[in-house]
Every structure is written in structure tokens, then in C-alpha cells.
Amino acid sequence: PSPTRRSKSRSKSRSRSRSASAGKAAKRAKSKTAK
């Protein structure tokens, strides 16, 4: 169960970083359209 738990935490951090990058891209696009 320890290895599966480790993979779970890894996928969690990966999804979190992905969502953060998506939010950044959305913010950039918003500022571009506003400009």
C-alpha cells in the first residue's frame, strides 16, 4: 500500500501544478483580450 500511496500523492501534485498552469494561461489570455 505504501507504493500506491506514493503514486497517489505524485499524481495529486501533478494535477495541482497542471491546474495552476491552466489558471495562469487563462489569466494571460484574459489580460490579452482586455488590452
Curated annotation (Swiss-Prot):
Keyword Chaperone: no
Keyword Nucleus: yes
Ranges in a coiled coil: none
Protein keywords: Chromosome, Developmental protein, Differentiation, DNA-binding, Nucleosome core, Nucleus, Spermatogenesis
GO molecular function terms listed in the Swiss-Prot or TrEMBL record: DNA binding
Compartments, record wording: Nucleus; Chromosome
Composition skew (Basic residues), residue ranges: 1-17, 25-35
Entry's Gene Ontology BP terms: cell differentiation; spermatogenesis
Tissue-specificity statement: Sperm.
Chief site of localization: nucleus
Region feature Disordered, mapped onto this chain: 1-35
Name this protein carries in UniProt: Sperm-specific protein Phi-1
Organism: Mytilus californianus (California mussel)
